[in-house]
Amino acid sequence: QRSTLFPYTTLFRSRDRHGALANLRLRLDAVYAGRPRAIVADRALAYVVHHCGIPRLLLEALLDGFAWDAEGRQYETIEDLHGYAARVAGTVGAMMSLVMDTRGAAPLARACELGVAMQLTNIARDVGEDARAGRLYLPLAWLREAGIDPAAWLAAPVFGPGIAAVVQRLLAEADRLYVRAEQGVAALPRDCRPAILGARLVYAEIGREIEASGLDSVNRRAVVSDRRKLALMARASTAWLRVGVDAQARAPALPAVRFLVDAAAMPAPEPRRGFYARTVHILELLETVEQRRRTQTVHVNSH
């Protein structure tokens, strides 16, 4: 049983998707009004957003990303794809940072960029799965540059050198953002650093698995073995001690995440303790939100 940012959502047919999203927004209204519905998850969310000072814009942006999925939106450029990834994953990075009492603009930027990098990895991994469901997230301009007509390919998705080149390019962009994001680890509370660094290492390793399969994510779905995950988490448990701070730690935010950073960089509430367990809990969100999103259905339990 996995946790989720919206544990009160389950899944149902796409014809109800827009109504479900509208209902989620109403529930968000109630949460921020301090009158959550009589649902455990709503009450828990109300506690977190008020106790941790989480701006509503972050959750609204996440729902916007779900709405873009409901529309079947495609992305012309990598910058457009950054905008999507900022909403469905950068928002989670920002909220994690706030839960861990890290509210400076620079570390928030790195947290959002980590979310974007993870989402790009998800997209590179799931090219075939998405295509068979009628979804295409690879930048359309990159496909054309590789000699691929996006509409024709989506109608009959096959692996070839052009797709391999686009997947490699997307992984390179994810890796660039992983390197930037790692610089934000040093700004986190010490007991949170191993978990965040471990998540960064495990997600980046998905890219290495894709490369090991010849970049064929049309016919195969790359998986990091449990043994390898444990090794990477063990590495993270000590590697965080060696994470330094360089110029990238203070680099300007990726343009697509600036609105998130601007919303989240605010005075901190009263200090809190005991964040490690909560951090590990929240680390599951990116993968869970991605899995929920890919079903293309959202169900709201309003009872």
Where are these regions (language model features)?
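Catalytic cores of Mg2+-dependent Asp-rich isoprenoid enzymes
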Residues: 12-117, 124, 129-303
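Single conserved hydrophobic/aromatic residue that forms the stacking wall/gate
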Residues: 1-10
